[in-house]
């Protein structure tokens, strides 16, 4: 078959290309040809002709083989990648093979590229990578992975990093594609299949989180596979590339790129490699986008997988991470389908942590978006999902063991199991709480109750909370469920925990069960449900826990029942008044009969135990039911408020309406249940019957049974009383048998009950036996008879009683009364019984008179403080007409005024009402306890006689000046109108009574004041309409007129009885903190234009703190107030002027600092103002003006009250109402903060805090406030806050608060505050110094005086600035500012740094500069010069900490400075260091600045390194150790290699040295000299000759001129140079001569101190090049110096000797040599000489020509001198040195023949041995001498005998093991 010309042509081209590649005979040619022919060759793979393609494949096979054998050959990678992306083909050609093979070869070529070349390819590879598809995209991605595998990340936050991001040029699509694939790559796990090289790649596996397609992309499509190690390498590279490369500059929150980065980091943070920790840390840099839809959806998709594309869920550890994020996201709760799958996966997981997080997620969803847990909102596939969740949780609990957790092998760790089970219970509660349907059938409630009862104690609180969360559902349960719930609660509450006392956990579980049951009872059933209330009563059993009892009583008290139910009503909006119970409504009680029926039924049931134990409370509640049923819907004193219990207890005593209503109700009761109930009460009261058998079922004693029985018997019908006849024997038996043991109260109750029943059965045998009274009967029998007979008389039932019996009774009583051994109080109470009911009328007048006389004689002297005697006396007065002196009764009672007991005085008041009104007294009428008795019968028998007389006597007492009489009269007057007020004789004198009470209001005694206030209330009630009107007007007048002190005797004048000078309080009684209020004038001054609150509000309102309530008797008067029944509000509505004056003042006084005043005022306000909020709104402006005025009042109470009131006012009203007066309000608020009174300041602080919050809300543009309005508010307020009333105020509290307010505004309203940023930054910076505590400033200034380092204090001050909230605020201001503000901000920072005075403000300025550089690096560049100049200027500040702060700022500024600026200020720093006036501090600051530049602007430092490095090198040798350390640190960090760096910058170093080594500052000269020495160690001979010469020239020139302290360092430098460059010196005669001359000159100087220092250096110099002249000169100078040493001390000692007497000399002489020997000076001199001699020995040893024998002789002579002179006293140092010098001299030669040398050595030995050969010489010296001797023996035989003999002598004198060993070593 013929081939076409195109095909042939193409094939020819392929063959040519293949030939050209094949004939390349070297790798270089092969590489060149590849660059040219390989890409075109690959294009032919797209040929339509198969033969051409086959030819290409064949060529490629050969090519690849050859390429593999030539690893050095580079492939045209860039061209291949470009071709793979856009092959140069016709549109119809298939480019697949071209692309794939281009990428295959490109991938091979990448392995051969350098790191730099690889990096250059990155932009090409990533550009448009998102547009590639399929295999091409996979291979390109793999190429990218290979490129970044060894990529070196730039430094964090550096310019290089920013440049790299721009270099990549990655568009948004590319970024998204790469981030998506990088994220997926971290989910990849290696295939478990072992890959063999010939085997094709597998594409058949998935990973958690990756589908088949996803895995294939990384493996099959890319043509690669990974093992674990390779995978980890690539992951590490990807992480570096993403976090420090392509995504490094992402800072915009919620941007798409940021979201993709966070998705990536989430996945990486759970990776199995150690990258997880790095990712977790990196994530912390950014806010988690919890509410970003894309991010949350991505996580949810990862968690649940995708069935559509076959992607499974991710691993459990990543699921846990995802759930921990979803648990904080609101958006995550919005997708029902996702929630369904998430919960299902989590709850079915075997991983404990995942299950726990799932439970938390369910709770999270339930809390925020419960409907999405609801089946209705889920997809059809997840029907009944909510039910599934709770069922699943319940099943899990069952599986773990239920009702008690069972621990088994499958159970996780105990703590883990406990926590998870707790969470399951809590989750269950959360779901049930929000789903009524689940609760309505009670199955879950039963389940939880059973769990609570039986599960482990650790779960108790969780189960209990879950149950309690359901109470909101209970009230709406269907009726059937409620019945079921009742049975459940009955079962729970009737459990007897005492049967399980041995098991404490079980008891606690039962208690928890009961507590929840009581809560359920109160929530589920209405108050009128008798069974529910019985459950409450069961809860009050005394063996229950306190909280159960408390909760049970709340269910029995209607007020708390309402409050409780209001608070649990979650389904509806509840009024605050309902929550507080302040809106009083009437709650219906269970019907009395129904409750009795339920109670009796329970007592008859098998489970009666619990009812019996709580019987006392059941009876108490039954009484409350009875009263409440009777008065339901009626106005009485029984208001259902928090004091309802007290009210209902006292109601039958004090409220006639209650009595009549109860009477009506009880009269109609006579059924069997009622009789059974009364019998029960009697049985419980008597406990045993007449046969002695136990009939009580309540296990304890309680007086309630007798009390309730007696109460009921007061109202029952005669028919009922007759049915109760059977009770009499048991009651009578109780009195007779237990007379001595029963309490007085029980005896009275029992006898009264018998008396009442007897009235209905007068003809019964029981009554006849009781009334048959004989003289000889017992006291018990008399006791009962005294109660029965008078009541029979009242009912006119005495016809069955023998006349003698009554007389016998009276005689028995008088007999007992006169008998000394009887209980007089009891007998008197019996006398009361027989007298008060008129029984004495049954006997003759004479017998009556005799009886009265006997009793009166017995008690009239005992009337003071004996209440029973007083009562008896009043009852005797009923028969006063039978006596001659009837006035005696009132006289004796009036005499009791001396008593100080309030209750007793009230008793006297009651008695006076009886004496005056007889049976017209309400007090006596209330004593009748017989049902249906007509009191008028008794009133006719005992008419009122002397009401007016006694009232006049009381008036007289009221007008008395005697305090005790006044108090008694006040109380008696109160009693009088209470009990006799209904009589015309009393009501006609209302004006007089009113006047007396008004006067009592001003009394000092609070009890009198309260009594008077209550008296006024009673007068108001009984007075006529005229009196009421005048009283109300007088009261209003007292409120609103300041002339309240004007004297008036009118009854209408509120202050008529009080003058301005009337003393109300003893000094000190009413202490205000600023002195005591003592006169009425003081009181009037407390308020502006308002009468005195202490007299009006406090006493006109009977608050519960009233003194009356503290008295047992007085409490009867503590009802209501004068305002309570008035219609003042109508009057206020009619009289607007009065209202405008009264309401603002009334409002203010509600907040009076005195609690009594404020409480009373609140009572009056609540009474006058029914609609409080409406009234406040109506009179808002008047109230506001009053309060602002009051805040400036001179009285602290007014100021404090006004401030508290205004605080309340502005919180309750919209801001628009007071916005116009905001500045005035702020001014007054700040004024109160600076008040002289601490309590006013405290309230002022609270007020300003609230103002600040209101201000923040009103300007918050982020919350929708109009920006224009916000700016308008701030334009007014901000100048105020930073003006003289705010930040610049004299008061510290005000300053601090203004500052706090501004900080809060910046924090919470950044948008609104933005335009004011520059001004605020300036103010805040300058404020730092003002707010610093003065004590710190003082301490810093006077640190030296307290021995404290000022720098330490300054460091703390600096730290205080950095950590200050104020500085954080500045930072926030800068972060929120715009580029356009930059110039203004920089100008204010410069201004602040120049104008600030204190350290904190200056430091703050420097820190602000740093923040600006960090935040606005690009925008800062134009201003860097100005700021650098400021920094340099601040180096001149006197405070080192300030200098350092600006030095650090300079480092940051270099980062944004142009090169010319950097060079300019670098040179200025160098100049500053070398200034002649430069101090250590200046040098330290320069060093800190350089260090800062190095750390924060590395690239800029490198640009000016040639300026800095010479200085750093030189400064490393500074004299100051701290500076030396600082600069050495900088040098180490800045130089890559020490010696190399020195060589690099040597010319610059030499230039700096040349300029500064001759500085006028000698310390700089020293530093330079030491630097030359250091240079010698850091360089070698290889440096250029001119530089060596320059070094010598620098040193020589520096030595010119006089000697100075430290000049020796330059000599040392010159010597070091000579040693280092000895050959150069030797080759240059001129140089050598010049050095010789300089050295000779320096050694010849006259300053011996200087010459002493340089002489050893001169010896070192000679050692380099010994010459005869220089050696001779050295010997001469050295000998001269050694002779001078010690001369000064000798002279001084000589002078001492001359002036001391002989005795002193003799005393100190033995110690003189020892003292001198060990002196520091002697040791220094000795060591100096030894050092000089040793250097001289080195000269001898280094002499290359003739041996300098003269120098040797000098050395030996000087050793001898050291041993024998008296100026330098030798020590072991010289002894040791002599031997060491000998060893050095002799040891140099192998053989010695010179006679002179041998002679000198012998002389040295002879000098050394005698000194060292004694017992005192230390061992080391002797050992060294033996070594010296051994060397002589070895090298000088002629001296051997002498030496050996000496050494043997040494051994004999002092032989030690070490000496013997050393001798043995040398052959001895």
UniProtKB/Swiss-Prot annotation:
Primary subcellular site in the record, as a coarse category: cytoplasm
Keywords linked to the UniProt accession: Acetylation, Cytoplasm, Nucleus, Phosphoprotein, Proteasome, Repeat
UniProt xrefs under Pfam families: ECM29_N, HEAT_ECM29
Entry GO CC: cytoplasm; nucleus; proteasome complex
Additional record remark: Present with 2950 molecules/cell in log phase SD medium.
Subunit structure, as described in the record: Component of the proteasome. ECM29 binds to both proteasome 19S and 20S particles.
Function: Stabilizes the proteasome holoenzyme, probably by tethering the 20S proteolytic core particle and the 19S regulatory particle. The proteasome is a multicatalytic proteinase complex which is characterized by its ability to cleave peptides with Arg, Phe, Tyr, Leu, and Glu adjacent to the leaving group at neutral or slightly basic pH. The proteasome has an ATP-dependent proteolytic activity.
The name this protein goes by in its record: Proteasome component ECM29
GO function terms (MF aspect): ATPase inhibitor activity; molecular adaptor activity
InterPro entries in UniProt: ARM-like, ARM-type_fold, Ecm29_N, HEAT_ECM29
UniProt record similarity statement: Belongs to the ECM29 family.
Subcellular location: Cytoplasm; Nucleus
TM stretches of this protein: none
Phosphoserine: residues bearing it: 1692
Positions carrying N-acetylserine: 2
Presence of keyword Acetylation: yes
GO BP term, pick one: proteasome assembly
